[in-house]
């Protein structure tokens, strides 16, 4: 997902993208940032060809600023060979929808390739802002034009790429949450004995969200206390959360989704304020007691760094973080992490796990583009041709989304061994199997923003969990009525069918 960014490389990437992609010249960055910008080693696992050379056209690419635009720098030598110059337009992570929608409505034609979060596809495609891609994908020869959609995992193909039976986008980032924890602490004999003495249970990674609170409280220590046989020189925390305004709602949904409830019933009545949902939000609120005091300012970067700097015992994060945790240039806990399914709910004598699938990224061709064919090839080149290299490096936040990404563990060179990389990929498969989707209908941005606003108010103590979710239900009904309830009911039923085709709901 992600807003994910290696902060130390930010300045270099911005400079490199502006200089190298817009002008085609300019000095290369040096030092650690230069290493961050170095293209991954080509794997040659995917066969592709250049198109017939375009006549020096400029393709304008818009996307959220940061390391997920790095592939355009990695492969900057490819585009001139196709007769294409790339110009990058960076926007803030939280501003993607507003910026792109504003330009679409204005008909400015400012973009050729549009990078966006796939929950917006219903809005963008249904309003005619995106070019249908099906005819482009059929062009010959295959090596130039075919993005091999059959290789894209079903959730990312059916939900991320399609609207009303047509393909409008290509996946570049397949997102899901996983739990990441300090295995050295969970296996430490002294910590195991202390946990057993205190709780009468063996110390294990949390299976349920109740376990999450218990284990988080256990590992929360003050400066001067002992942790795994050493005296702490700063406070240490059992867990941390993405509690910042913007996407904190996803960490609430992680706790609620295993209930089997959906955002709406068949007639668009919100189910977001059920007793199970209220209990889930209360768990989220309670978890902040075991988190750093500034956790309400934690987005992706801060949550990642809290773990990789050795300040917390466990987090729920996107599946790219283990790659960064294995990279000594980004992590102080190399070799000390393990990962698995997010905690779940005990239902009917078993634990049910559901992992939220927030954000993700797709690339599409703007319907207003004057260079649609060139824009399509650029999108296809990033989404398919170079995708293994882009998802396997620790210097992007792009996550696996195709079968080929799982069958080449040797590409994930930040891990010490191929076996370790293969184990990581197995855990990612588990996370995706537990996947729970976002809202994939027009209005998704408004529904999710209302949810996030009130989740954040509950985290701040400004509303109780019940007050917060009752307010969400009221606002969701208002959004539905404003967009047209009967229309939204029809679209929601179509979305439910897509969820079923993708294997995400029964």
Pin down the residues of each PLM region:
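Short, solvent-exposed loop/beta-turn-alpha elements that line the ligand-binding surface or hinge
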Residues: 49-53, 134-151, 188, 193-205, ...
């Amino acid at each position: 997902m992600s807003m994910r960014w290696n902060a130390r490389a930010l300045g270099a990437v911005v400079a490199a993208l502006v200089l190298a992609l817009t002008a085609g010249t300019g000095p290369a960055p040096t030092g650690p940032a230069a290493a961050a910008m170095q293209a991954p080693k080509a794997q040659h696992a995917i066969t592709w060809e250049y198109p017939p050379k375009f006549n020096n056209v400029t393709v304008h690419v818009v996307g959220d600023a940061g390391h997920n635009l790095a592939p355009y720098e990695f492969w900057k030598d490819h585009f001139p060979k196709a007769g294409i110059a790339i110009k990058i337009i960076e926007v803030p992570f939280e501003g993607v929808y507003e910026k792109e929608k504003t330009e679409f409505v204005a008909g400015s034609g400012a973009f050729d390739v549009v990078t966006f979060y796939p929950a917006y596809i219903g809005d963008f495609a249904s309003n005619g802002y995106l070019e249908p891609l099906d005819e482009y994908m059929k062009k010959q020869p295959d090596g130039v034009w075919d993005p091999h959609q059959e290789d894209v995992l079903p959730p990312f193909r059916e939900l991320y790429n399609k609207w009303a039976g047509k393909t409008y986008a290509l996946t570049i980032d397949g997102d899901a949450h996983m739990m990441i924890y300090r295995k050295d602490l969970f296996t430490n004999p002294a910590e195991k004995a202390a946990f057993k003495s205190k709780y009468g249970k063996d110390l294990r990674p949390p299976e349920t969200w109740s376990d999450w609170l218990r284990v988080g409280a256990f590992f929360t220590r003050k400066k001067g206390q002992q942790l795994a046989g050493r005296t702490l020189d700063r406070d240490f925390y059992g867990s941390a959360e993405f509690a910042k305004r913007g996407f904190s709602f996803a960490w609430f949904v992680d706790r609620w989704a295993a209930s089997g409830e959906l955002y709406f019933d068949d007639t668009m009545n919100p189910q977001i304020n059920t007793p199970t949902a209220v209990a889930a939000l209360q768990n989220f609120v309670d978890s902040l007691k075991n988190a750093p005091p500034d956790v309400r300012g934690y987005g992706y970067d801060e949550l990642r760094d809290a773990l990789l700097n050795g300040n917390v015992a466990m987090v729920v994060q996107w599946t790219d973080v283990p790659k960064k945790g294995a990279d000594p240039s980004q992590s102080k806990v190399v070799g000390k992490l393990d990962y698995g399914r997010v905690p779940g709910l005990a239902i009917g004598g078993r634990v049910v796990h559901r992992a939220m699938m927030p954000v993700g990224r797709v690339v599409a061709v703007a319907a207003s583009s004057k260079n649609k064919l060139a824009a399509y090839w650029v999108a296809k080149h990033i989404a398919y041709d170079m995708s293994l290299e882009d998802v396997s490096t620790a210097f992007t936040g792009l996550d696996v989304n195709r079968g080929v990404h799982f069958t080449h563990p040797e590409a994930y060179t930040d891990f010490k061994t191929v076996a370790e990389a293969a184990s990581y990929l197995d855990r990612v498969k588990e996370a995706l199997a537990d996947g729970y989707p976002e809202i994939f209908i027009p209005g998704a941005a408004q529904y999710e923003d209302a949810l996030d606003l009130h989740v954040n108010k509950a985290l701040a103590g400004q509303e109780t969990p019940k007050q917060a979710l009752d307010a969400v239900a009221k606002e969701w009904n208002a959004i539905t009525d404003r967009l047209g309830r009967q229309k939204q009911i029809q679209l929601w039923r179509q979305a439910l069918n897509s969820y079923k085709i993708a294997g995400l709901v029964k």
